Amino acid sequence: MTLWLDPVCPFSWNTARWLASAADAFDVRLMSLAVLNEGRELPPPQRARMSDSRRVGRLMAALGDELGPHAVREAYFAFADHYFDRSAEVSDKLADHVVHAVGAQRTTAAALDDTSYDAAVATSHHASQDAHGSSAGSPLLTINDHTVFGPVLTGVPEPGEGSDLLEAVRVLVGAPQFSELSRPRNHP
């Protein structure tokens, strides 16, 4: 199972925490909302988020390059815990925390602004889109070579509910006839 995510997407954080509680194992790979939205006119708050997306994507790519793809999951959880749950801004201080958390020796906070990692981020992003079969946002989930957008979760299910949700998603993703399921994020 592979979770493709943009590190600054709040819905991806919910999905990642759900999978961590419900799945035996899953990989985390990068997709990039910054790459997805290249060339589009965006309002200022979204432009700022895309800047964070690009910078954190570089850091994750650098850590993956140094430590291997497994490090991206650990780095993501170290980052997201501070970024989402503690409202930390993308900064050298946060990057240093992530680098230290995964035990990197070569990667530093300078990776946030190192454009040499942009190609690796773009390559991973395009792999996510290829796995999905069309343009899609974050998160994407691959189960048994079938990739879907989502699930978009507005919170993290309780442990028993999380296991049930994972089984339901596995069944849906595995059904060749299944295409899409959606409801408003603010449903009653």
Spans of features found by a protein language model:
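A short linear-motif detector with a strong N-terminal bias
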Residues: V8, S12, D118-V121
